[in-house]
């Protein structure tokens, strides 16, 4: 069993490395196309690559493929999500975990107990879980959310800001548990689309024509605002009511392995020591 998992992981990492190499080559080809179309000089790293320019005449536009991590079950079966917390959670974090569980229609909340992370991940993989959500806190305030996809990753780590629970919202109303409509706004970069893929695969696929429930993920300056509303059609139009919870997420790390794998390759990481880090939008 362990040998088979190790072999599958090696094969998967090899495919990802090949895919990454091809995507980098395709980005350079796109830069050549843009420079030729706009009459601008080539960037230095492309201008110095004579082999790339020699092969450009044989270039064919690469077609975007479904990410291998989600291709097996994407759009076919409902995701199986487990929501849990760090050890010894406060009352507020436990309440927040219940509300996050209600965000994802097919999720289950698990009391962490004395589970160490490796045993928790092993239990999730044996039970056919597709995603694990772990919530963290500092002095009773939720501060981080981690999403790990099984069986091979990726793992996305977000910091949490301005968390408002449902009972803190005036006239929040009842929580609807029907499958929601999803809105993803202003995710314009390849990294942003990667985050969209991770988030949307937490929800069941399929058409939801009659669902009155809407969950919005709006990117503003790399802070992802999460809002949940229900709407009712009236004679005069549409009435919208927020039901919560309400919070902002900021991506700070994306790794290619699962949560317990400390040696996993880092796909992207926020680096605050770079001078332009605070002036650049990554999503």
Curated annotation (Swiss-Prot):
SUPFAM superfamilies the record matches:
Class II aaRS ABD-related (SSF52954)
* Recorded GO MF terms: RNA folding chaperone; rRNA primary transcript binding; single-stranded telomeric DNA binding; snoRNA binding
Name the UniProt key words of this record, in alphabetical order: Nucleus, Ribonucleoprotein, Ribosome biogenesis, rRNA processing
> Where is this gene product found?
Nucleus, Nucleolus
Q: In Gene Ontology terms, what is a biological process of this protein?
A: rRNA processing
User: How is this protein annotated for GO cellular component?
Assistant: Mpp10 complex; nucleolus; small-subunit processome
Q: Which Gene3D superfamilies match?
A: Probable brix-domain ribosomal biogenesis protein
Q: Where is the Brix domain?
A: 79-260
Question: What does the record note on quaternary structure?
Answer: Component of a heterotrimeric complex containing IMP3, IMP4 and MPP10.
Its job: Component of the U3 small nucleolar ribonucleoprotein. Required for the early cleavages at sites A0, A1 and A2 during 18S ribosomal pre-RNA processing.
Q: What is this protein called?
A: U3 small nucleolar ribonucleoprotein protein IMP4
Tell me the classification of the organism that encodes this protein: Eukaryota, Fungi, Dikarya, Ascomycota, Saccharomycotina
Task: Name the encoding gene, please.
Answer: IMP4
């Amino acid at each position: 069993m362990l040998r088979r998992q190790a072999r599958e992981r090696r094969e998967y990492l090899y495919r990802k490395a090949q895919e990454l190499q091809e995507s980098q080559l395709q980005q350079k080809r796109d830069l050549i196309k843009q420079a030729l179309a706009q009459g601008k000089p080539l960037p230095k790293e492309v201008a110095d690559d004579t082999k790339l320019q020699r092969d450009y005449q044989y270039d064919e536009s690469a077609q975007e493929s479904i990410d291998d991590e989600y291709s097996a079950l994407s759009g076919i079966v409902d995701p199986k999500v487990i929501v849990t917390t760090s050890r010894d959670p406060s009352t507020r974090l436990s309440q927040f975990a219940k509300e996050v569980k209600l965000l994802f229609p097919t999720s289950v909340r698990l009391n962490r107990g004395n589970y160490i992370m490796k045993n928790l991940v092993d239990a999730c993989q044996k039970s056919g879980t597709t995603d694990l959500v772990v919530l963290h806190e500092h002095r009773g305030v939720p501060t981080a959310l981690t999403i790990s996809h099984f069986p091979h990753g990726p793992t996305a780590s977000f910091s949490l800001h301005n968390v408002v629970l449902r009972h803190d919202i005036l006239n929040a109303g009842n929580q609807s548990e029907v499958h929601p409509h999803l809105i993803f706004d202003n995710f314009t970069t390849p990294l942003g689309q990667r985050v969209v893929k991770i988030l949307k695969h937490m929800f069941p696929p399929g058409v939801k024509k009659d669902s009155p429930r809407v969950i919005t993920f709006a990117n503003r300056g790399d802070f992802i605002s999460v809002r949940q509303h229900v709407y009712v059609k009236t004679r005069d139009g549409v009435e919208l009511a927020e039901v919560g919870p309400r919070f902002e997420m900021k991506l700070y790390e994306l790794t290619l392995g699962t949560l317990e794998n400390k040696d996993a390759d880092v796909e992207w990481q926020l680096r605050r020591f770079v001078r332009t880090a605070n002036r650049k939008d990554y999503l």
